[in-house]
Amino acid sequence: MDKIHSLTGMLDLYNDGDRDNLSVKVFEVEKVLKRIFSNYQLNEMRTPALEDTDLFKRSVGDLSDIVNKEIYSFNDRNEKSIALRPEGTAGVIRAIIEKKLDQSAHKLWYLGPMWRYERPQKGRYRQFYQAGVEILGYPEGAPEFEIISIICSIIEEFKLKNCSIKINHLGSKTDKESFCEALVNYLEPHKDNLDIKDLERLSRNPLRILDSKNEDTQFILRDAPSIKDFIDSSSIQMLQDIRSQFSNICSIEIDYSLVRGLDYYSGFVFEAVSSDLGAQNSFLGGGRYDHLCSNLGGRDLPSIGMAIGIERFASLLDTVIPSNRMTSF
């Protein structure tokens, strides 16, 4: 009989003590992250791997690559469209609403498998583990500093080099609307040079075009308006204060071109990058999403979160500590 093999991009993880094994690094990373989350007095939440597909269409965005190209979705025996979760935040917020927990503040963490149909490469798989932090019910201010503090603790704990945290602010709803209007006006003469996907982004969510992977689009955007000219001074001051407070611990860079690939982000956004990962150099990201809860049927719940890809992060550890010298942290 022919052998049955694992599916493309799906890894078996086995903690056999071999320090050259990615599995061992994954287990080490998970163990340390759990300890860091405990130090920050975060509570664990676990949500189902399967969710209603509409949850991700309404949260991540039906124009996102995740929903259009990467999500594993299918109809169950009742012809209901369900999906393997491609990310963790939407499920957490769905649970918060369903359990009527959106009336109070919470500080949570989660860790579990996620699924995306993308081209497997080093540190990127079709089934991957993701850890995340969600700080819910707290207005903008202290949570931004706390989330960056958590990231700096992770970077410090693993002694990471060649990495930095990029931060930006997408402004208020009014700021964003003014910026999007200016962006659309700038891109209008260039519409014939945009591909179909970017044209759709331009018409439905112009901010997302800044996240385009199309080189021609990025060339056009070189002289586009900057969101820095549209957000208020307090937002800029927050970015400067965060950079100032943590600059002696981590490399912090204000990047006004940074947007996140998920539709629910608003206000403060960030990502951690490493030059050791090559062109796709991000291993952690997140931001504020004050309106996601109400978009999913709950009440407005000011919130901020972050997520880290475990395998991708674990692939960095060889650049920090040689495998044969790696010990438990």
Predicted regions and their residues:
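Hydrophobic secondary-structure block in the mid-to-C-terminal portion of proteins
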Residues: 158-195
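Polyanion/phosphate-binding surface patch
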Residues: 2, 45, 49-82
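A structural preference for short, hydrophobic beta-strand core positions in alpha/beta folds
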Residues: 46, 167, 254-256
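Auxiliary tRNA-acceptor-end handling modules of aminoacyl-tRNA synthetases
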Residues: 1-25
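Acidic, His- and aromatic-enriched active-site or binding-groove loops in soluble protein domains
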Residues: 65-77, 181-210, 274-276
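Beta-rich nucleic-acid/ligand-interaction surfaces
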Residues: 50-67, 166-179, 259-267
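Positively charged, Gly/Ser-enriched RNA/tRNA-binding surfaces
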Residues: 25-42, 51-52, 69, 79, ...
